[in-house]
Swiss-Prot record:
Organism phylogeny: Eukaryota, Viridiplantae, Streptophyta, Embryophyta, Tracheophyta
GO terms (BP aspect): cytochrome complex assembly; photosynthesis
Signal peptide residue numbers: none
Record's keyword terms, sorted: Chloroplast, Electron transport, Membrane, Photosynthesis, Plastid, Thylakoid, Transmembrane, Transmembrane helix, Transport
Similarity remark: Belongs to the PetG family.
Species assigned in the record: Welwitschia mirabilis
Protein name: Cytochrome b6-f complex subunit 5
């Protein structure tokens, strides 16, 4: 029971962390472009 709960939490967190990393990288990229101009 606990294992399924943990696996569900992990499977739910992985996409959220990936999206978060992608968004932060994209924002830093946009910020760098604005500074270069």
């Amino acid at each position: 029971m606990v294992e399924t709960l943990l696996s569900g939490i992990v499977l739910g967190l992985i996409p959220i962390t990936l999206v978060g990393l992608f968004v932060t990288a994209y924002l830093q990229y946009r910020r760098g472009d604005q500074l270069d101009i």
